[in-house]
Amino acid sequence: MQHNLKTIFVISHSTLTIILFTELVTGIIGNGFMALVHCMDWLRRKKISLVNQILTALAISRIFQLCLLFISLVISFSYPDLTTTSLIKVTCNLWIIVNHFNIWLATCLGIFYFLKISNFSNSLFLYLKWRVEKVVLVTLLVSLVLLTLNSLLINLEINICINEYQRNITYSFNSYYHANCHRQMLSLHIIFLSVPFVLSLSTFLLLIFSLGTHHKKMQQHVQGRRDASTMAHFKALQTVIAFLLLYSIFILSVLVQIWKYELLKKNLFILFCQVAYVAFPSFHSYILILGDMKMRQACLSVLWWQKFRKNYVEPLDL
């Protein structure tokens, strides 16, 4: 019985590890492709639109985030003794920065879609709609205030943790950190995650309301077909729904770690949470690629080129 349980554990652990590293690699490739397409378009046109600026910055921030997580996992799994107080402090600070821009740039993308596509006669909405670039800029500047506060609180918590550890050094700091400090870090993390989530959810609900209002107006004038505005609403809603779904999984993975903290001692549970956590920055990039005609065409061009190259090279090898 114990042998069977051990076998199941080993298989589950190996499967989750493969899934996790596959997510990381595919996420880096997807975000790298997105950044490359927009940068090449920028160089060719000598200008870049606001939405492409957001998408490029989002892709770059996620590449850094996924690379950082990849390196952290390799060190954690292969060289746990290298996890010192200094390394954890540096890793936490880097993680706060890249994760902050990942979340807030995605939120700004949702705000951009909402202001560009929604139709409201409210004077405040119209004022913001005509100043969408300033709205995005102000949102990012306000988010920097939250980043500073988040960084200060996290560093304060880490310093307290280090001081307590140095008073009683009985085992490695990595073990002490995960046993005594990691839960507080996760709690702070979820507090700062809630702000952009509420903003994204609000834009989603307002988009639905705008679509409903527009649909009623169109039913009075046009029967049996969808106009360009309705299609734009549906396209934006599909993107925002996918974003909110992945974002919800992202937040739930953190909440589960806080509520069931005793399970963090089990490597299998940690891996499962990491798989859920990484799904957001990895898969969201592919949703954005599929939702953008220019990136979708570029992706198809690459696939056709690979197919042609394979068919062309193979006869030469013979």
From Swiss-Prot:
One of its GO terms (molecular function) is bitter taste receptor activity. It is a multi-pass membrane protein. Keywords: G-protein coupled receptor, Glycoprotein, Membrane, Receptor, Sensory transduction, Taste, Transducer, Transmembrane, Transmembrane helix. One of its GO terms (biological process) is detection of chemical stimulus involved in sensory perception of bitter taste. Residues 38-53, 115-134, 211-238, 290-318 are cytoplasmic. The keyword Signal does not apply. InterPro entries: TAS2R. Putative taste receptor which may play a role in the perception of bitterness. This is Taste receptor type 2 member 117.
